[in-house]
């Protein structure tokens, strides 16, 4: 993962965190990445964590196959694991990491929040819902042409 910085009117790429494990064909090595995260922070249930990664990856693949990505060339799964990587470096708990991995799938309305609640529990669903509410509040106070954290108009109406 790299972030752009501007120095003397020139854009440079700066590495901001360690890359995640990849397979030979350029896909995320979920097992390797789970092990990498487990070496950085405590995972209460590595199987649940792995399942969240697999679910997010499958949802992302379906979006790609249906040409329904949120932006050309984007991967909601990879962005989700990058967010989870940041949270792992901050030593947040597993529920927070799982919520980060799954957030974009819910935000992009590829999976209902209720499905996440059933499969991953109230805490994960509550965290995702809370982030959606914060994004909606931010949008109300600072309206932009684009979405903030991907909230939809319906989410804004719910907060109002």
Where are these regions (language model features)?
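Active-site helical microenvironments for divalent-metal-assisted chemistry
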Residues: 1-160
């Amino acid at each position: 993962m790299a972030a752009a910085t501007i120095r003397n009117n020139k854009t440079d790429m700066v590495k901001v965190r360690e890359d995640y494990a990849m397979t030979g064909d350029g896909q995320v090595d979920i097992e390797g990445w789970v092990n990498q995260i487990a070496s950085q922070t405590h995972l209460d249930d590595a199987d649940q964590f792995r399942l969240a990664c697999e679910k997010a990856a499958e949802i992302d693949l379906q979006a790609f196959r249906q040409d329904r990505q949120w932006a050309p060339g984007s991967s909601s799964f990879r962005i989700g694991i990058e967010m989870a990587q940041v949270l792992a470096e901050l030593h947040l708990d597993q529920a927070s990491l799982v919520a980060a991995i799954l957030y974009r799938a819910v935000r992009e309305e590829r999976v209902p929040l209720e499905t996440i609640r059933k499969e991953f529990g109230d805490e994960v669903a509550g965290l995702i819902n809370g982030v959606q509410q914060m994004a909606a509040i931010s949008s109300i106070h600072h309206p932009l042409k684009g979405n903030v954290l991907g909230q939809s108009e319906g989410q804004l109406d719910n907060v109002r």
